[in-house]
């Protein structure tokens, strides 16, 4: 999830091209479990990117909702590549607990800026935590390493967004650069994980 000013700059143009380019890359790969759902997640991500080109509360909530749907689609795709329950592993259970703590902290930070954002941010953060845990539960031969890297980078990117928006007053070029870099890398890794899994099944 990324936030930028509503202007045609190399950065905003790059964001607009990112998801369509990755969708084409995925479409050119052999069809595999979850690939159609990932394409749906990419569509929601693209809608979120466009919404977050503005800085109003309405645009932020629209972007948040789009990325929430994207993460739900990613969860569904990852579950199709897993043969174990998400919470079967103690490490994943500990991560979910830690993610819940981070979600609470982010919601409290959001409430300092705008109390109406607290609940949506909490729900979004919990969903993001579930997405990362689902990636960790993917079978190793189904692209788990790259999928987990992508999901983890998504968590880093969105945490940086929270820090920038709710703690740094929506300022900080280095933070914004970190958001954009980790976000692009996250989406790329997820596509490569899906492609790696499809090659192993071929």
Predicted regions and their residues:
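Short amphipathic, positively biased membrane-proximal segments
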Residues: 1-202
């Amino acid at each position: 999830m990324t936030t930028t000013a509503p202007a045609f700059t190399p950065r905003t143009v790059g964001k607009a091209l990112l998801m369509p380019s990755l969708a084409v890359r995925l479409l050119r790969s052999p069809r595999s479990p979850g690939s159609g759902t990932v394409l749906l997640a990419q569509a929601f991500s693209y809608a979120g990117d466009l919404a977050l080109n503005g800085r109003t509360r309405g645009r932020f909530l629209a972007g948040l909702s789009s990325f929430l749907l994207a993460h739900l689609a990613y969860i569904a795709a990852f579950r199709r590549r897993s043969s174990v329950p998400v919470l079967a592993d103690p490490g994943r259970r500990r991560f979910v607990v830690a993610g819940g703590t981070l979600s609470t902290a982010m919601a409290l930070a959001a409430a300092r800026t705008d109390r109406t954002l607290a609940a949506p941010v909490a729900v979004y953060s919990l969903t993001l935590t579930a997405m990362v845990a689902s990636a960790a539960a993917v079978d190793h031969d189904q692209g788990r390493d790259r999928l987990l890297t992508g999901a983890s980078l998504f968590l880093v990117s969105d945490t940086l967004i929270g820090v920038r928006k709710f703690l740094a007053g929506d300022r900080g070029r280095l933070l914004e650069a970190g958001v954009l870099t980790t976000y692009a890398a996250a989406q790329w890794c997820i596509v490569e994980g899906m492609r790696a899994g499809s090659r192993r099944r071929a």
